[in-house]
Amino acid sequence: MGLPVVAIVGRPNVGKSTIFNRLIGERVAIVEDMPGVTRDRLYGKGEWLTHTFHVIDTGGIEFGETDEILTQMRYQAELAIDEADVIIMIADSRTGVTDADVELSRMLNRTGKPVVLAVNKADNPEMRADIYDFYSLGLGEPFPVSGSHGLGLGDMLEEVCQHFPAEDDEEKRDDVIRVSIIGRPNVGKSSLTNAILGEERVIVSEVAGTTRDAIDTPFERDDQSYVLVDTAGMRKRGKVYETTEKYSVMRAMRSIEDSDVVLVVINGEEGIIEQDKKIAGYAHEAGRGVIIIVNKWDAIEKDDKTMQRFTELIREEFKYLDYAPILYVSAKSKQRVHTILPKVNEVAQAHSMRIPTAVLNDLVTDATIRTPPPSDRGKRLKINYATQATVKPPTFILFVNDPELMHFSYERYIENKIREAFVFEGTPVRIWTRKKT
């Protein structure tokens, strides 16, 4: 089932994006400054007390050229119906209840999903007290908030979290590998999903999200349990969704966040385009295990150098995914589909690998002897010791005399030495420097 999804809807200019940015906090920042690794201000992850959830700013999606407010709101409501466990409707305390608010509240009431009404721009006590008219919308208690000042959001989130579906015990099992299949439209995600599941003799069940359309599909193969994340996301949508690039990116981002290993699917017939790089960049930035799948490989004319040339192209276009294995398959003919799950197992194992501290420090010491650390104005970097902080992805901390002396190239050198000594295929390796205390 993955993390709960909260959709923010409302008519234009009520402050949806301001509240969205408040909820996701610093996660909107771009982690790495390299091509293909960007973050749209459309979708993010929020936290409140012990709860973590996805947030969708439906106002960030433009469906067509129409300026008709009601049409735009209807699209927002449809998106919320498809995606959300809980819907936050934003209204404006300064304008009061409008006809558009009334119409939107009726749409949302028909979804049958929990709706929390937030009355924004209630920036002072008088405005916070004067919201009783909003009870007329029939959405229960209105919560006065100020997105610009951060006021009232705690009470609103407390109500939102009350409606989250209970977490399935199956979701918590460490031995289950969660896999998502992502890519732009028409690369063959649905066919690949069916090809993978079609090879399985034991499909345990289809577990539907309690209040949303997304379906995770558990299955087993050779005594290993898997969950294919959000297979409902592969279904054909209406034209408005199929033609909306941002929608497919948002869908991919949510699947990535809920996964251990991500299969990035490329259409071998069409080659690589900018949207491929954007979607793959999200998988890298999220720190998930990554396998690049070139689909429809049976449909192109080949010579003995074709695969080599395509591999070189992938390595050039996806420089930040140089650790990701590449598989050439055909979902339609099932060619090499049998190689996918064994590779998923290898990547998942690497993604959760721990290196003993003593072994890690021996490796780092040897690396610094072979290539001494850099110096700046007579002061040389000294790595005192190293430790592995976390897994998924493997993250290492180097305690040093002065973090400012650590150059990116030397950090990459240490990463390469770690990769040479241990099999970290398919997983990013994070290295952080801290000042030794």
From Swiss-Prot:
UniProt cross-references to Pfam families, sorted A to Z: KH_dom-like, MMR_HSR1
Record's keyword terms, sorted: GTP-binding, Nucleotide-binding, Repeat, Ribosome biogenesis
Domain EngA-type G: 4-168, 177-352
A single GO BP: ribosome biogenesis
CDD domains: EngA1, EngA2
Binding-site positions, GTP 1: 10-17, 57-61, 120-123
GO molecular function: GTP binding; ribosome binding
Binding site for GTP 2: 183-190, 230-234, 295-298
Function: GTPase that plays an essential role in the late steps of ribosome biogenesis.
Quaternary structure (record): Associates with the 50S ribosomal subunit.
Annotated protein name in UniProt: GTPase Der
Species this chain originates from: Brevibacillus brevis (strain 47 / JCM 6285 / NBRC 100599)
